[in-house]
């Protein structure tokens, strides 16, 4: 089954607060943020863009690695997410721009950024337009580092295949919804292509003038307890369809009761490192 995406609801205060609370209490976004920041060549960076930066989880990771004189610009179209970020992350090196990722080049000078980092969001955008905007604002030699959920990229880490010992929490949610509410999940489409495979990414990056210099399929290890907390965030709550949030939380609680809290849950990611070619000598 194609993974459920979360496109709408990011600019609602209740969601922004729940999302930020999750990032503070659980390691999931902190871990992926630090992984991307580590790959972004930030030791001598002057300007770094946190693209689709939300409430600032990735900005925190970037700020820990850049020099004291450097700047971070966090760009996101959800003002609610940025309001939470402004309240909770007050580093003077960080500024916020409320804008769609596709309009990034409207807000930064050409060839001004040393790196652009995008965590857990690129597949929600018009990637061809975003890649072109990133290429416009990156300096020659600058890096663009992002990740794509394995279900959207069509990849799975070996740990994702071997760690599971029973039904996933998502599968149990669908089961409970079917039994208690007559829910019928969307039909499986085994032949459906992934939304954003590496081949498509590479073609679009090349068209934008960027070169793929590294890729890796990674595994993020968590627990059923962390997965439950993540699924409590309104934009991620399941199942899809005509349910209230309260109903979804009741379904989640019933499904979670059928699991072991510390049972392993593994998420696959495709990490991509691209670079704007250096100017010819």
PLM regions and their residue ranges:
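Class I SAM-dependent methyltransferase SAM/SAH-binding core
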Residues: 47-51, 55-104
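A short acidic, Gly/Pro-enriched loop at the edge of an enzyme's catalytic core
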Residues: 106-116
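A short glycine-rich, Lys/Arg-flanked "PGG" loop and its adjoining helix->strand segment in the class I
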Residues: 129-140
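Short alpha-helix
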Residues: 192-208
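C-terminal helical/coil "lid" or tail adjacent to the Rossmann-like core of SAM-dependent
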Residues: 213-263
């Amino acid at each position: 089954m194609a993974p459920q995406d979360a496109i709408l609801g990011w600019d609602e205060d209740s969601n922004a607060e729940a999302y930020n609370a999750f990032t503070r209490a659980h390691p999931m976004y902190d871990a992926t943020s630090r992984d991307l920041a580590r790959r972004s060549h930030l030791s001598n960076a002057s300007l770094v863009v946190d693209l689709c930066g939300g409430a600032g989880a990735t900005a925190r990771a970037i700020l820990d690695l850049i020099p004291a004189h450097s700047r971070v610009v966090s760009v996101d179209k959800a003002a609610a997410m940025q309001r939470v970020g402004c309240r909770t992350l007050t580093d003077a090196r960080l500024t916020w721009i409320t804008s769609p990722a596709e309009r990034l080049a409207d807000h930064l000078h050409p060839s001004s950024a040393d790196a652009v980092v995008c965590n857990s969001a690129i597949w929600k955008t018009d990637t061809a337009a975003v890649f072109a905007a990133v290429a416009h604002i990156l300096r020659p030699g600058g890096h663009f580092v992002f990740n794509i959920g394995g279900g959207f990229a069509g990849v799975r880490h070996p740990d994702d295949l071997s760690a599971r010992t029973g039904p996933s929490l998502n599968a149990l949610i669908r089961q409970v919804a079917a039994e208690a509410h007559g829910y019928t999940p969307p039909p499986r489409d085994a032949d459906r292509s992934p939304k954003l495979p590496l081949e498509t990414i590479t073609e679009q990056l090349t068209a934008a003038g960027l070169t793929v210099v590294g890729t890796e399929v990674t595994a993020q290890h968590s627990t059923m307890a962390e997965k439950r907390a993540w699924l409590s965030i309104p934009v991620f709550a399941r199942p899809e369809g005509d349910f209230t949030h309260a109903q979804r939380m009741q379904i989640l609680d019933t499904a979670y009761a059928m699991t072991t809290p510390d049972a392993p849950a593994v998420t696959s990611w495709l990490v991509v490192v691209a670079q704007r070619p250096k100017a010819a000598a």
